[in-house]
Amino acid sequence: MGLVQMSSKELERYALIRRVVGKELGQSFAAAQLGLSVRQIKRLCAAYRAQGAQGLISKQRGRASNRQTKPNTRSRIMALVHTHYSDFGPTLACEYLQSQHGVTLSSETLRQWLIADGLWKPRVRRAKRAHPSRERRPCAGELIQIDGSPHAWFEDRAPNCTLIAFIDDATSKVMGARFYPTETTVAYLDVLERHVRQHGRPVSLYSDRHGVFTNHKESANTPTQFGRACLQLEIESILALSPQAKGRVERLFQTLQNRLVKALRLAGISDIESANRYLEETYIAAHNKRFGVEAHNPQDAHRAYAGTDVDLKRICALHHKRQYSSTLACQ
């Protein structure tokens, strides 16, 4: 008998089957050790008696898998990737291949192809500093995390701008998001007004300590313009002490800086007005379907706004105190 190459698994199987054939072990014991049925052990014993060790080697060795992708199929898919999705990650590229080209492929298969073509580098998993996860609020509308992200949202096609987003803590759904030239009080008040119109008044808003939300002047107890609007709308304003505390909105922007930037590019969008229309009509709904979760409690904690549209606009506008001089000039 010539030299037979075996894997470690096949060597273990060979050692046990040989002892079963030699009446040193029972078939039931061997079946339990190998995780096989007694019927399979009987087949292996018969193969060993007929062919020796060669009979225990897998018949699939050296044969291409029936599930292996055909070379011409791989070439066609990678041509699409190189043309449209060369800087996409495997998961996102798979989603676009499915939705835009009708190509169904596992992200792991595509990841291997991207690595082979030099389009993706395997990530080294680094130990992360532990930040205890805060439990989600049970109801939608109980806590809305808000923040703004200045970024090259249109890449090199237009100047940088800021995306302001409101995300629900209970569901991770984007409740509102809009682009603005810069991160300003007026921008936040605009998103707040839109949120109240569409969803109602949330119980609380969770933000960082940006000057829009807190007055940094010493001994200044007066609220900011945004804080005053929250007071008038009876919305609690909570200030986070660290970025990790409002992790959901931070992770949202990480996702959007990857996915939304590419979506805007593929849609040929390079201006704020078109981008806001795209967010409202297309992107937010698709994002929430992909990443949203169900709240633990199905009750919505948003409260209806009983005032008029004019009242809401007045609340969400900038307020300034003025006085009249003796000549009735407004100062």
Located regions from the model:
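Mobile genetic element proteins and their domesticated derivatives, centered on retroelements
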Residues: 16, 30, 41-44, 52, ...
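Short, charged, surface-exposed loops that flank catalytic or proteolytic processing sites
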Residues: 147, 263-278
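Residues that mark the N-terminal boundary/hinge immediately upstream of a DNA-recognition element
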Residues: 25-26, 89
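Basic, flexible linker segments flanking DNA-binding modules
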Residues: 52-146, 151-152, 298-309
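RNase H-like two-metal-ion nuclease catalytic core shared by retroviral integrases
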Residues: 68, 205-208, 216-231, 235-259, ...
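C-terminal, beta-rich DNA-binding module of retroviral/retroelements integrases
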Residues: 284-331
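Mobile-element integrase/transposase regions
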Residues: 72, 83, 103-104, 115-174, ...
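Short, basic alpha-helical/linker "hinge" immediately adjacent to a nucleic-acid-recognition surface
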Residues: 3, 7, 18, 27-82
